[in-house]
């Protein structure tokens, strides 16, 4: 979404987004604290994705106990970002609260997706998908804070660098 300025009012948001904002307020009441005279902006990020994992040997059709299992994850994530530049500080801060829901196993359609790409590119297909992890729901909630040294002004031409410190808690 575009950056939003000022106080958040969940009742003014579309219902699913408003529910998510209320959930964040319940799970982490301090997230919506007033930033006072500190400049702050916020936005919502929606992620949809698929991850897949396979053992190293693509030709084996049996379960390989000492290798990574066949697994897929199909997920939808909502992340709320708040960017704050404390007045007296020499850094910017990004606070993120993210909720990810998904499915693991055949419901993730990882085998079908991988086979589609492998057929289209003429790559040998993996043969052991019958041994993938079973269907189950996936859930993750993340709280993260990132710090970046603040540099005022426009981007300078040429090479540059960034140092971003962070800490996070992920449950799920």
Each predicted region: which residue ranges?
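Outer-membrane pore/translocation modules
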Residues: 30-172
């Amino acid at each position: 979404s575009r950056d939003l300025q000022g106080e958040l009012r969940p009742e003014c948001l579309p219902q699913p987004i408003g529910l998510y904002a209320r959930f964040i307020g319940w799970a982490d009441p301090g997230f919506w604290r007033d930033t006072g005279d500190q400049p702050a902006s916020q936005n919502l990020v929606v992620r949809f994705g698929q991850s897949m994992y396979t053992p190293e040997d693509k030709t084996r059709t049996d379960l390989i106990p000492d290798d990574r299992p066949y697994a897929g994850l199909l997920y939808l994530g909502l992340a709320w970002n708040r960017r704050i530049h404390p007045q007296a500080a020499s850094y910017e801060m990004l606070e993120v609260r993210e909720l990810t829901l998904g499915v693991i196993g055949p419901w993730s359609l990882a085998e079908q997706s991988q086979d589609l790409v492998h057929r289209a590119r003429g790559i040998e297909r993996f043969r052991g998908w019958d041994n993938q992890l079973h269907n189950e729901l996936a859930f993750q909630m993340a709280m993260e804070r990132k710090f970046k040294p603040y540099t005022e002004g426009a981007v300078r031409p040429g090479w540059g660098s960034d140092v971003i410190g962070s800490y996070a808690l992920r449950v799920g």
